[in-house]
């Protein structure tokens, strides 16, 4: 398992000799390291992350030492690496790839979809996601998915141990849960509205705070959630103005989009209140009391213009989605 904090990389792979003329190349998904999780979110704004570079080279080397057929597979980020690495091989290697399995794996950056390499292998890919999938619907994909009946809900279904099996096959369903569909719409609209540059700054800032606290794994946060959240906000308010503003603005936009998508799906004939999110200076009020922090924040005219710009882009995207769903 190759973890490089400087490069923001977490990568692992293994090769199995399945039959005399067939090999399986398996890419590991994200482990519990914070570096690995940060690298995952880099895929929202970058068309190439360090683990993908390693995956391309690993698959190339395995193909060079073996003349038979290849199958490529992976769970979560490993599934992304499987498809991405296959798409970036020479055509001669791609012709030897029989199947690509993506198990609840995020898609790819939108810039990859139109490449010749991706188009040559996409028909060989199989995609499986649980009924309440979150990770498996992230980013873009042209691979149809199979929905697996699963236990638990939300992110807990990401573990394949939660997927239901009957005899020698997965139990398949016809539809995703409503929560999965809404989360998918939210994340895709959010990453479409926010520029790649702002997404990079947002995630760099978000993870920087946890690294400064000495967090090494997501389990550190999970088992000490309350303590780390308090430290997170303390450090956030001590950051320079630009970083603090991007963290609040882009994060707030995510929640606003989620709320509005949920509101638009309601079929009941009751009046639903409009969510009006506060401006930055209203959002960050002074906290008082034991174990609390006191902060002040002044929003500049430029920051407010940027905030309104993103709100306008979101409204335009929402209108385009409605028009596409209900053409005249």
Predicted regions, residues:
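Short glycine-enriched nucleophile-adjacent loop
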Residues: 82-91
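Alpha/beta hydrolase fold serine-hydrolase catalytic domain that processes acyl esters and thioesters
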Residues: 1-23, 27-69, 90-328
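Gly/Ala-rich beta-loop-alpha elbow adjacent to hydrolase catalytic centers
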Residues: 74-78, 82
């Amino acid at each position: 398992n190759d973890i490089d904090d400087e490069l923001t990389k977490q990568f692992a792979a293994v090769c199995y000799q399945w039959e005399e003329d067939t090999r399986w190349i398996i890419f590991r998904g994200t482990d519990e390291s914070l570096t690995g999780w940060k690298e995952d979110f880099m895929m929202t704004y970058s068309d190439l992350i360090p683990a993908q570079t390693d995956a391309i080279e690993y698959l190339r080397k395995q193909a060079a030492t073996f003349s038979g057929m290849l199958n490529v597979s992976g769970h979560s980020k490993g599934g992304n690496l499987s498809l991405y690495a296959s798409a970036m091989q020479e055509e001669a290697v791609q012709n030897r790839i029989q199947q690509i399995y993506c198990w609840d794996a995020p898609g790819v950056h939108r810039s990859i979809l139109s490449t010749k390499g991706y188009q040559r292998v996409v028909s060989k890919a199989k995609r499986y996601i649980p009924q309440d999938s979150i990770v498996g619907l992230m980013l873009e994909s042209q691979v149809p998915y199979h929905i697996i009946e699963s236990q638990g809900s939300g992110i807990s279904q990401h573990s394949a141990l939660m997927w239901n099996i009957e005899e020698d096959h997965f139990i398949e369903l016809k539809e995703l849960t409503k929560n999965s569909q809404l989360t998918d719409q939210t994340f895709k609209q959010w990453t479409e509205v926010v520029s790649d540059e702002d997404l990079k700054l947002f995630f760099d800032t978000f993870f920087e705070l946890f690294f400064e606290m000495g967090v090494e794994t997501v389990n550190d946060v999970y088992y000490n959630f309350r303590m780390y959240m308090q430290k997170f906000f303390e450090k956030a308010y001590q950051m320079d103005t630009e970083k603090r503003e991007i963290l609040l603005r882009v994060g707030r936009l995510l929640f606003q989009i989620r709320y509005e998508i949920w509101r638009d799906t309601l079929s009941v004939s009751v009046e639903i209140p409009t969510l009006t999110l506060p401006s930055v200076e209203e959002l960050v009020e002074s906290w008082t009391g034991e174990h609390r922090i006191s902060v002040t924040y002044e929003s500049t005219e430029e920051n407010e213009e940027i905030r309104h710009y993103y709100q306008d882009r979101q409204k335009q995207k929402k209108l385009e989605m409605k028009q596409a769903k209900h053409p005249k």
